[in-house]
Amino acid sequence: MKQTVYIASPESQQIHVWNLNHEGALTLTQVVDVPGQVQPMVVSPDKRYLYVGVRPEFRVLAYRIAPDDGALTFAAESALPGSPTHISTDHQGQFVFVGSYNAGNVSVTRLEDGLPVGVVDVVEGLDGCHSANISPDNRTLWVPALKQDRICLFTVSDDGHLVAQDPAEVTTVEGAGPRHMVFHPNEQYAYCVNELNSSVDVWELKDPHGNIECVQTLDMMPENFSDTRWAADIHITPDGRHLYACDRTASLITVFSVSEDGSVLSKEGFQPTETQPRGFNVDHSGKYLIAAGQKSHHISVYEIVGEQGLLHEKGRYAVGQGPMWVVVNAH
């Protein structure tokens, strides 16, 4: 398995393309100059395209991915109704979902043969919309509205329209600020990192049409931490055994172990990392974690080791200015 790591650096308007080898070492293979401040990125389900959101002219760009080395070639673009904060796709590669924090909306862009062709739906009134996350069964779009302490739930119709479910939302504790999410491989649990109180909620997905319950909330910070909380990103290993979340104020990655059924998280430790880690990701083998420092302009690669899933630094690399997003593609 070959793996390519993409790093988005909005301040220098670049995507750095790296080869990740089996020992966790990175080799720079390409630097792409992007026409705008590039932030969120996602690889298409068929691994043919990388979709990226750019500002200040709000657009989604599609780059064709070379199957041999992961190199990028611009392919298409489509306008967006707000500044892109987060980007994702459905599992069949029919739609791109874009959450916009500043515009307070989530939009759906239709794809034709992998290329974006236009927005088909926009839902407004989602204050602080920070991500759009399709459930493993491709039926429910989870959309955290950070400023409203709620996660809105939509069914995605065949033509890409978003239909509010019943119930239409789940709520967090006041002041939590739900931000990014991941799902357990067994498709029974979701995990949401809350930006404003730096906690992680575990949501049990009992029924795709309702009966969703928060079964655990864990503080992700050390006991003596008294500074402003500012959590950012969350990821889980492919085998579902280890979960990670980061806080930008503390420049820290919190390590969690996950119970066999996915219902219980246990805090295992903390890893100091790059300054202001806005984004990170786990590779497809589940052996390595790559974290980007928005203020350090570097990335660090960590090996995931032991039953606890603790992190051991393998290498550190300079990238563009203000790196914010990390995507890993296996090909």
From Swiss-Prot:
SUPFAM superfamilies in the record: Nitrous oxide reductase, N-terminal domain
UniProt pathway annotation: Carbohydrate degradation; pentose phosphate pathway; D-ribulose 5-phosphate from D-glucose 6-phosphate (oxidative stage): step 2/3
InterPro entries assigned: 6-phosphogluconolactonase_YbhE (IPR022528), Cycloisomerase_2 (IPR050282), Lactonase_7-beta_prop (IPR019405), N2O_reductase_N (IPR011045), WD40/YVTN_repeat-like_dom_sf (IPR015943)
EC number per UniProt: 3.1.1.31
Catalyses which reaction(s): 6-phospho-D-glucono-1,5-lactone + H2O = 6-phospho-D-gluconate + H(+)
Key word Hydrolase present: yes
Keyword Glycosyltransferase among record annotations: no
GO biological process, alphabetically ordered: glucose metabolic process; pentose-phosphate shunt; pentose-phosphate shunt, oxidative branch
Entry's Gene Ontology cellular component terms: cytosol
Residues bearing PTM N6-acetyllysine: 287
Molecular function (Gene Ontology), one example: 6-phosphogluconolactonase activity
Keyword annotations: Acetylation, Carbohydrate metabolism, Glucose metabolism, Hydrolase
Domain of life according to the entry: Bacteria
Purpose of the protein: Catalyzes the hydrolysis of 6-phosphogluconolactone to 6-phosphogluconate.
HAMAP family: 6P_gluconolactonase (MF_01605)
PANTHER family found in the cross-reference section: 6-PHOSPHOGLUCONOLACTONASE, 6-PHOSPHOGLUCONOLACTONASE-RELATED
Record family assignment: Belongs to the cycloisomerase 2 family.
Protein name: 6-phosphogluconolactonase
Source organism of the structure: Escherichia coli (strain K12)
UniProt lineage: Bacteria, Pseudomonadati, Pseudomonadota, Gammaproteobacteria, Enterobacterales
